[in-house]
Amino acid sequence: MVLMIVSGRSGSGKSVALRALEDMGFYCVDNLPVVLLPDLAHSLAERNMSAAVSIDVRNMPESPEVFENALTSLPDSFSPQLLFLDADRNTLIRRYSDTRRLHPLSSKNLSLESAIDEENVLLEPLRSRADLIIDTSEMSVHELAEMLRTRLLGKRERELTMVFESFGFKHGIPIDADYVFDVRFLPNPHWDPKLRPMTGLDRPVAAFLDRHTEVHNFIYQTRSYLELWLPMLETNNRSYLTVAIGCTGGKHRSVYIAEQLADYFRSRGKNVQSRHRTLEKRRS
């Protein structure tokens, strides 16, 4: 069974995540004090039910030791996982402006911007311990719920999930990436007028890139690097490894290479997911 601890800055989507987890069969509790986590887990162990609990600045423990003690007191049948949601500063400000809700730290006579910044500092101990960090800045409510369903229901218990994610540098680097590889130096299909409207998922673009030795060398050396360190990453008690591949616009080279790497590790029996940030943004 899983004890999913959901944390993140206010406005990043914790309520949406809890609703999605509840739809997946989790017993969900909003803002449960950390010291009560073992009691909740023991009561649900008898019912063989996974749980999801949100933690934010309102119920943060006074010290990291309190959090660690609570986790070590869980029944052996429970596997704790920490999901941290985040969004960039401007997105959080816009969301608060749209909903006109008060920030949890507004009672300290802070401006909204200062409250968001202070919350970021207070939550850093949880963020640094997270098994999975999701940046919701460019996600709709539906997209966040769908991502959680895909990642959680598509994951075999206690197995590392490799996520290969393409992106465009002009749109920013994904903050949830464990590794970032820059492929802007590779031949660019964008300069071929016939290939420009296509993506790295289309065969003509794939054929163009496949003709270049440097593309093959990059894929080979990148997968060799990942294969070298993957055994240690798998034994490091982590749930996800997110590998981000970036080109200029996130449309051709990064998409193709992310798919090639995903296919390779999938063929080796690894649990693999792929995501293309720019293409998904264009479809939304």
UniProtKB/Swiss-Prot annotation:
GO terms for molecular function: ATP binding; GTP binding; RNA binding. GTP binds at D56, V57, R58, N59. Residues 266-284 are annotated as: RNA-binding. The keyword RNA-binding applies. ATP binds at G8, R9, S10, G11, S12, G13, K14, S15. Keywords: ATP-binding, GTP-binding, Nucleotide-binding, RNA-binding. The keyword Nucleotide-binding applies. HAMAP family: RapZ_like. Belongs to the RapZ-like family. RapZ subfamily. Homotrimer. Modulates the synthesis of GlmS, by affecting the processing and stability of the regulatory small RNA GlmZ. When glucosamine-6-phosphate (GlcN6P) concentrations are high in the cell, RapZ binds GlmZ and targets it to cleavage by RNase E. Consequently, GlmZ is inactivated and unable to activate GlmS synthesis. Under low GlcN6P concentrations, RapZ is sequestered and inactivated by an other regulatory small RNA, GlmY, preventing GlmZ degradation and leading to synthesis of GlmS. NCBIfam families: PRK05416.1. This is RNase adapter protein RapZ.
